[in-house]
UniProtKB/Swiss-Prot annotation:
InterPro entries for this protein: Pentatricopeptide_rpt, TPR-like_helical_dom_sf
PPR-type repeats, residues: 69-99, 105-139, 142-176, 177-211, 212-246, 248-278, 283-313, 318-348, 353-387, 388-426
Residue ranges that the Swiss-Prot or TrEMBL entry lists as coiled coil: none
GO MF entries: mRNA binding
Protein name: Pentatricopeptide repeat-containing protein At5g27460
Keyword Amino-acid biosynthesis: no
Family that this chain belongs to: Belongs to the PPR family. P subfamily.
Keywords: Repeat
Length: 491
């Protein structure tokens, strides 16, 4: 969690009441400043990006004699970040840092480091952090601004780099909160090094670093993998006795999950009942953790009950929430209830998100109900839904399973278009099933075009080339092009 400090704004950087004025001006254009000045701010937030650089727009506002507040700048940068326009947000941060009238806070430094990593990569992020460490002016904030770099290592599972950074931070005396230790525990769990999680906890105890709720939850998960249920229960008892933390629904869910994985279903059910009593009536998050765990227990009554109660929480129910409850109902085998919930979602959705319909589509295909799947797919298209790679993957599996290969081939061609814009790739089994169909039907032209497409996408394999070579040999055709593709693929 990035540590926030109050930044000091000086001279013309007025910080009073600007946020409300900015929101008003961006919403209805009622700001009292000049149209040109107002437009310079709106230009930054243009959906397709500003026509001019962010720095020139900000400088124009300053040069025209108008005040720019830190609150104003932060509000704009947050909106840019929310829409994943990290490069524009970084331009703003760089401009702010170069202004003599702004004193950067810990929050600003950490945010800039995070944006550098997101925009330019880890190498530049590392260089910026090193610059902070060797700057006497910024050394005081570097102590709290290292987390984005550590989190980037964790996200990319860069164990050695994360360990080296932790060693450096320890030598500088920076490790005084549980946050970096929690990040290391996440990294070790993600890389399957559960014993090291326990070592991190021992290090925290040795250095008198307090554990927080996340520390205990990660520790319990690791103990389950290393030592079993008894060790997890010991950690949980220690947590209950730790007056600095409050045991909430998240820790009880962690404990329940351990019991489920270890086959102690009744213990898990009792823990989940206690967790239900601790749910926050102003936030849905906990409800869906419990819904998922009830589904793992095969308890469809628990899934439905929590789902209905979650509706009383204020705020719009998101597509992610619907995906969670639909997946849980499908997992418990209650397709009828899943269809009812899906109809409920369809009746209120503004934008048709195919990730929701894909849950039901996958259930139909797995149950061998291909006609239902096709009917649902048709309805999705009518409602304006745009199939994604997962939609086509599900349908291809269904069509291959019921030997409707022409439809599977059409779907694969749709997938070829999508693969130019995403990292997903179809399974080897589906790829080979279509190739084997071409061989069986002696469709050598289609097979050759198919393999060429796969070759361009880097998906051609030795079994695929062997199949095509067999077809060419059988048809007594030259295979120079095939050998050339194999050579390029180093096969």
């Amino acid at each position: 969690m990035l540590i926030r400090c109050v930044a000091v704004a000086k001279t013309r950087f007025n910080t009073t009441g600007v946020v409300s004025r900015l929101v008003s001006s961006l919403a209805d254009g009622s700001d009292t400043s000049s149209v040109a000045n107002r437009n310079s701010l709106k230009e930054i937030l243009r959906k397709n990006g500003p026509r001019r650089s962010v720095t020139s727009l900000l400088q124009e506002r300053i040069d025209s004699g108008h005040a720019v507040s830190l609150s104003e700048l932060r509000l704009i940068s947050k909106r840019l970040i929310r829409s994943n326009r990290y490069d524009l947000a970084l331009q703003m941060m760089e401009w702010m840092e170069n202004q003599k009238d702004i004193e950067f806070s810990v929050y600003d430094i950490a945010l800039r480091l995070d944006l550098i990593i997101k925009t330019h990569g880890l190498k530049q992020g590392e260089e910026y952090f090193e610059k902070l460490l060797h700057s006497s002016v910024s050394m005081r904030v570097a102590k709290s601004a290292y987390l984005p770099l550590l989190r980037a290592y964790v996200k990319n599972k860069m164990v050695k780099e994360a360990e080296a950074l932790m060693e450096k931070l320890n030598g500088l005396g920076f490790l005084v909160t549980p946050h970096p230790f929690n990040e290391m525990m996440k990294l070790y769990e993600a890389s399957g090094q559960y014993e090291k999680v326990v070592m991190v906890v021992s290090m925290m105890k040795g250095n008198k670093i307090p554990r927080n709720v996340l520390s205990y939850n990660l520790w319990m998960n690791a103990c389950c993998e290393v030592s079993g249920v008894a060790a997890v229960e010991t950690v949980y008892k220690e947590m209950v006795g730790d007056k600095s933390v409050e045991v909430g629904w998240s820790s009880l869910c962690t404990l329940a999950n351990v019991y489920i994985k270890s086959g102690f279903d009744e213990k898990a059910r009792l823990v989940l009942e206690d967790a239900e009593k601790m749910l926050n009536r102003s936030n849905r998050l906990g409800y869906f953790f419990l819904i998922t765990l009830y589904a793992s227990l095969g308890n469809k009554e628990g899934v439905v009950r929590l789902w209905e109660v979650s509706k009383s929480v204020c705020g719009r129910i998101s597509c992610v929430n619907y995906i969670c409850v639909l997946s849980s109902l499908v997992k418990t085998g209650d397709l009828e209830e899943a269809e009812r919930v899906f109809s409920e979602w369809e009746a209120q959705c503004f934008n048709y998100d195919v990730r929701v319909s894909n849950v039901l589509l996958g259930a139909y295909v797995r149950n061998g109900e291909i006609r239902k799947a096709e009917s649902l797919h048709g309805c999705v298209l009518e409602r304006g839904g745009t199939p994604n790679y997962k939609t086509w993957e599900i349908l291809m599996e269904g069509w291959v399973k019921c030997e409707n290969m022409e439809k599977a081939i059409d779907a694969m061609h749709q997938v070829f278009v999508l693969m130019r814009r995403c990292h997903w790739r179809p399974s080897h089994n589906i790829v080979m099933a279509i190739a084997e169909y071409f061989e069986k039907e002696e469709k050598i032209e289609e097979a050759t075009a198919y393999v060429r497409d796969l070759h361009r996408l880097g998906l051609a394999s030795l079994p695929l080339y062997r199949l095509l070579l067999r077809m060419h040999e059988h048809a007594k055709r030259p295979a120079y092009d095939i050998y050339e593709m194999m050579k390029l693929d180093k096969l």
